[in-house]
């Protein structure tokens, strides 16, 4: 999957997959992570693992890559469908969350850095 000149490979960093395959693999992987009670405890009061933040960061980093791909490769089609307000609103809220809690490194945001800066501008 690509976002401009940036290429995202699956899992081990060597497996190149198409964007639809990447998204499907990602959604399945995220579901597996969320269903794992060792990572996301289901019972109230159960402690989260010490590396919980690492799991969350990894999930959100990979989701950012999907946004980057959509903006680079599909935004004109999104505009044609008159769906840009919905996409922009979802991305804006995502960015506010990951920025507030520093969950995605700035280096990861480079493929759509100008858009990120514009959206986060006070």
From Swiss-Prot:
The name this protein goes by in its record: Putative MOB kinase activator-like 2B
GO CC, alphabetical: cytoskeleton; nucleus; phragmoplast
Pfam families per record: Mob1_phocein
A molecular-function term among this protein's GO annotations: metal ion binding
UniProt keyword list: Cytoplasm, Cytoskeleton, Metal-binding, Nucleus, Zinc
Record's keyword annotation contains Nucleus: yes
Main location: nucleus
Family: Belongs to the MOB1/phocein family.
Location relative to the cell: Nucleus; Cytoplasm, Cytoskeleton, Phragmoplast
Disulfide bonds: none
Positions annotated to bind Zn(2+): 69, 74
SMART domains: Mob1_phocein
Record keyword Membrane present: no
